[in-house]
A protein has these predicted regions:
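Beta-strand-rich recognition/accessory modules
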Residues: 2-25, 30-31, 42-43, 74, ...
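Short, hydrophobic/aromatic-enriched beta-strand segments in well-ordered soluble domains
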Residues: 38-42, 51-53, 67-69, 80-82, ...
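Short, solvent-exposed beta-strand/turn "edge" segments of beta-rich domains on protein surfaces
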Residues: 51-58, 91, 184-187
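Acidic (Asp/Glu-rich), glycine- and aromatic
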Residues: 56, 60-109
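A broad, low-specificity signal marking well-ordered, structured residues that form hydrophobic/aromatic
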Residues: 36, 78, 119
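Short, hydrophobic/aromatic-rich segments at coil-to-beta transitions
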Residues: 31-39, 60-63
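Glycine-rich (often Gly-Gly/Gly-Pro-rich) flexible segments and glycine-rich loop motifs
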Residues: 110-115
Length: 199
């Protein structure tokens, strides 16, 4: 049919210590048939956010987010929070799940041996894939030979094993929380939270 479905119940958010983000600058850097790209500078009380994004007509969206610490601090968490609309979170594939009905509550932690960095959650003709990476990303081998070139663990997302992904049913949809956990930062430290979406 021609009637679309809303995948998200609310806008996705990269939430971090320091409160709400305030936009300082926004610029369209590419606008052509099939693709648009932009960059933005945001800040909160704890971090400066340098963001580059690109969206293509096939539903692929790439975000490269660099957080720069504005002060020495103990950080509770930086997390990509996604809330799917009711009825969208029916099936799941990735993070060790082979594909099928999703298990209602799911928790996953980074582990280089598992060679996993992406999840898809959705319904028939509607869903979202989220892949997490960083500024040193190298495409892993996804065949029987992947042990010869293991996954490059994204340092900011993994955070020494503190990071992971929780997926839960809520009263009005499904929540996906890709978290990185507690860490200490020094003023000027850079954290690279890159992610790719396929809708």
């Amino acid at each position: 049919g021609t009637t679309g479905r809303s995948v998200l119940a609310t806008p996705m958010e990269l939430a971090a210590d320091g409160g709400a983000w305030k936009n300082l600058n926004f610029e369209i850097t590419k606008h052509k048939q099939g693709a648009i790209a932009w960059k933005a500078l945001n800040q909160n009380d704890r971090f400066l956010m340098d963001l580059e994004g690109q969206m293509e007509s096939d539903g692929n969206i790439e975000y490269k987010v660099t957080l720069i610490a504005r002060e020495d601090a103990s950080v509770q968490d930086v997390a990509l929070q996604t809330h799917l609309a009711s009825g969208i979170g029916r099936y799941m594939m990735g993070l060790g799940e082979k594909g099928g009905y999703w298990p209602n509550d799911f928790s996953w932690k980074w582990n280089v041996e598992k060679n996993q960095d992406a999840v898809w959650v959705g319904d028939v003709n509607a869903g979202i894939q989220i892949r997490l990476y960083d500024n040193k990303y190298e495409r892993p081998l996804n065949t029987n030979f992947y042990h010869q070139k293991p996954l490059h663990m994204p340092v900011s997302w993994c955070n020494g094993g503190n990071g992971g992904i929780d997926i839960h049913n809520t009263a009005d949809g499904t929540s996906i929380n890709a978290y990185s956990g507690k860490r200490s930062v020094k003023k000027g430290d850079r954290l690279y939270y890159y992610f790719n979406l396929a809708l």
